[in-house]
């Protein structure tokens, strides 16, 4: 037979299925055989190429070897067909060509395999099963045979859908996402078969098949049926397969379009949600089952209870029967398996009984009795029906079956009851636990409410006390103002009366006064006591602390007028008076005449009595101070001037004093215990041979004690001239003008004083003023008297007429009194070398007695009082002078408020995993994670109160404006309820104190100490550069980072120096680390931080700061009096270390080094690195954990 050339193109495409079929019928068997021979060679070669491309491109057409045949496991990537599925068995003709080619590529394609028989059988079966051809009238047996041969030819030796172009197009579509693609029919040389054509091929007039909406399985089955019926040629099968693939690809692409692209996190979230829903559904099913079981159990229990109530046997009998059954089963445990098998034993017995009954049919009654006995003895039936109904068993078989059922029911019933009892017990325990938890929560809530109510009540009470205190202060201020106005009015009247009386009496008593003044100015001081007895008694009465309150105000005013006009000559002084007294510096106001002496008081027996201490300006009665060396003697040149002046003054005094003597005769009897009078500075300075009487604050023989001066009182005091005094000693210049102007007429009538006497008086007054300025008590309380000085000045005596009316209007009390401000609590203290301090508050006395010894108080009174005052202010005692907040803002700009510093965000939404890690005096510290940055930060929570508001604002402002690598970074601050949350940088290494607490086991070497000092100095240099002071440098405020970073923290006590206020004097900080100038209350600057750094350096070297073994008050006293103790084992430390300490701990602030200069010290060159320092931190942390573990083990034992 002549071979036809190989066809390179498929059959031409037609539009109608009938045309295709007619073209198909024209082919004969011969043509088919020729076509088969022509296609064998090329197909095998092309199949090899295809197989190579499949290996290279990793096609989705995978094959599985079943016996000697290989079949693909799937057709396309989007529509897999598993070989194990039942549908895959129907598709063997479709993929038969592929399996054959893969097989023939190995066997050169020259022989048929066993698969040919299989497909022949399939085709023959299909032809035999379809005797009537579906293609129409032209079909016959020959066409059926030719169709079978064609299918054998085309399906066995050629691939159904796989070609090189198919693989290329499939691969391109796989990597071109979401792009439409179809397999065009032109590539196969055929035409596309529509749904109408397929339906017409099937010959069905029913509804057309919907490819788009049908499933893959339906389309596959439809295609297989058509192939099995022989309705497709090669082109049609390819087109149909392409159609099926395109439909599935379109569905997949449409699904991808509806489903947006997602990343891995979203995919995980979706999967988690899907699993959660699945678990929820499963839990719901389980829950429903449990509910159903619960309802069933309840119903069963209800039925059992009703059944028990109807039972004829009692509960005791039932329990007895159950107990017998349990005992019997325990006895049989030795021969029985570990689990009970009651039914098996009963069956065996029953079988034996059945055999006996079969053998002995005549003895039925005996067997029945035996069965009954076995039932009673072995089973102990608790079936209540047998007892209630008393059933008589007639047949042995029925009795055996009943026994088996009863035994099984009894066992199940017991197990069910036991399980029910356990469940009830579990539920009861669960309910009790829930009730306990609810009760605990209610109790906690009630306690929390009670605590909040208590705190609220305490705050309200504090506010009420504050309001009452302010109200009392207002009332006191009002009363005081009224009294001052009344006293000023009386003083004006007395001055007017005294001036009138002086003019009337000056002309009548001039001669007699001249003689009296001459005798009073003698150097020996031997004047007649009788001539001055009456005025002396009057002044003694006025100076007495015991009787001053009993004198009528009008009489006192009259006596003041008489005394201002003139005074009798001074009495002779006793020889035992100490000449070393310097208490004249405490004398009252200056007299009308510069050299007028004070008059001593003489009792009825003619004995000199010292004047009360309250007379000379002291704040307390009965207090004493150590005396001073005697004053230098003055030349006798001014004696004549003194005599002349005394003549003129005493001229007017005798007349006025005679009038007042009769009014106070009754009061003079009580003045016998008066003390020695005081002498004014003018007397002491202008009398060459006069002796200076002892101070009203006592004359002592102690020479070592320093001279102290009594601080002034705020209430009114009567001076030696009779005028009232409302101010402190520093007001004498103002008072001097008043008294001098009131007596100017009398002094001018006698010719005045000589110029030399005036000059000497001025020189001596300036000396006394310098002494007062240097006085300890003035220095201590001078700042608290500034406002009082300006308000207590008395008006001049020469004012009259309209001037008096204007002053009245100015002094008139307004109907509304404003809120008091700058309220002070002055403490008036005196020192006696014999008795110690006098006039101290009770708290101060307790502090001194409990912390100081008597010799220390005598030797260092100023230091003791300094330390006590500092401690009182630091501890906030009630009687301590108030610490006034600085009125200067932190900067020259307007002051910052809390609203300017806080953020309005909710910190609970920003931070999570908030865990407490510590607490202190200022508040609690928490560790949290910032959700925005995913960084660990620290949160400091503080209660907002009026007392700490300024401190909080100061700390936040300082941290916010400080950006340095050695200062803890500030993040933000928030207000949550009544708390302030300050978010800052988290330092995982803790504070330096935690390392120093392990000093016994871990000591820092010099390089590590130098590293800490270097980092701290860098931070101090930064804040000092911006004129800020930290004022609380200590180990607790030095924080350590994860890599050994050192940073400053806690700026609550920090201060900002300004152009106006370049120094500070407020008492803040921690006592053991405070500089001496800060303890004494002197002005200080940046150098206090350097001192604190030196103390902290010693703390790192010795494990604790100096004097830590003493109480704070004692430590402060030792620091101010004895200085710092020498460092322990000084020889172990290098010369540079000791020099660095000396520069830091220099008492003289001028010589003390600054932070910038210390950064260049040679000691800091030995500093180690941060990681090396952190080794010590890590070792201290491990040591602390070990200690805690050991302690926990001990407590557990």
UniProtKB/Swiss-Prot annotation:
Essential cofactor(s): Mg(2+)
Modified how: Phosphorylation on Thr-585 results in cAMP-mediated activation and localization to the cytoskeleton.
Pfam families per the UniProt record, alphabetical: PBD, Pkinase
Catalytic activity: L-seryl-[protein] + ATP = O-phospho-L-seryl-[protein] + ADP + H(+); L-threonyl-[protein] + ATP = O-phospho-L-threonyl-[protein] + ADP + H(+)
Biased amino acid composition, Low complexity: 80-94, 346-381, 494-523, 636-653, 671-707, 739-756
InterPro entries xref list: CRIB_dom, CRIB_dom_sf, Kinase-like_dom_sf, PAK_BD, Prot_kinase_dom, STE20_Ser/Thr_kinase
The protein's name: Serine/threonine-protein kinase pakA
Organism from which the protein derives: Dictyostelium discoideum (Social amoeba)
Lineage: Eukaryota, Amoebozoa, Evosea, Eumycetozoa, Dictyostelia
